[in-house]
Amino acid sequence: MEIFITGDTHGDFRRFRPDIFYEQEHMTKEDLVLVCGDFGGIWHGDPRDDAGLDWLEDRPYTTAFVLGNHENYDAYKDYPKEEWHGGQIQRIRPSVLHLMRGQVYELNGRKFFTMVGASSHDIQDGILEPGDPDFEEKFQQLEQRGALFRVNHRSWWAEELPSEAEYLEARANLERVHWNVDYIISHCCPSSIQNVFSGGIFKKDALTEFFDEVRQKCTFRYWFFGHYHSNMVIEKKYAMLFEQIIRLK
């Protein structure tokens, strides 16, 4: 099994074209490409998403992804869950898989811990409620100002951060493997690692603090994450990915 990892796609899958990602020539459905959040392939939750998902299904490999903050969480609620390599997934297409929050998967003899989500940093000017009687007026005013805002259940979802039950499930699954995995796949990263490259621009939250707990308690080889739209290695074992596609050895 070959495993490749990349960063945010936001529904734009051009990096996986055969003339760009040429390694796929020798890949099969047993091989994986993992996306570290902000997958964006299910944004509308209706047939408008089908072209991109069908294109991924036509690739010779299997696409797997965790969710980020720019995702339509409502659109995932109707997909059934199933067990896959020791953890829970949602099968979007036969070979397009959502790797769920707080799961541990065993792939090719290696353990992967996945944790979904991140805080949106483009909501400084607020989150509008579609049911607000003044919604249209407020929306137009914010648009004209070029404000950074989102609309609840249209472009922002509270589920971008885990619930208490999901944190408990994540800890229980890590306990089950004695806090010992090979790789961690997430969208954002621990608060302490965030501080190294951002100088405090990105603020800590419950998820990044949980990741610091994982960092301290868990034995792992590498931690791969997206979210920050750059490619960078921090302290040798934390790999920030955006458009780069790397191969696990």
Where in this protein do the model-derived segments appear?
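Internal alpha/beta domain cores that form substrate/cofactor-binding pockets in large enzymes
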Residues: L161-K249
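Generic domain-boundary/flexible-linker signal
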Residues: R14, H44, D74, I123, ...
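Active-site-proximal loop/helix segment associated with metal-binding centers of metalloenzymes
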Residues: R110-I201
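Catalytic metal-binding/acid-base residues of hydrolase active sites
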Residues: T9-H10, F39-G40, N69-N72, A118-S119, ...
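Acidic, histidine-bearing metal-coordination/catalytic regions of metal-dependent phosphoesterases
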Residues: M1-R15, D134-F135, G146
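Residue-level detector of alpha-helical segments with a strong bias toward transmembrane helices
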Residues: R17-P18, R48, D78, S119, ...
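Active-site-proximal beta-strand elements of phosphoester/diester hydrolases
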Residues: M1-H10, G109-A118, I185-H187, A239-F242
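Core catalytic region of metal-dependent phosphoesterases/phosphodiesterases
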Residues: T6, D12-L107, G200-D212, Q216, ...
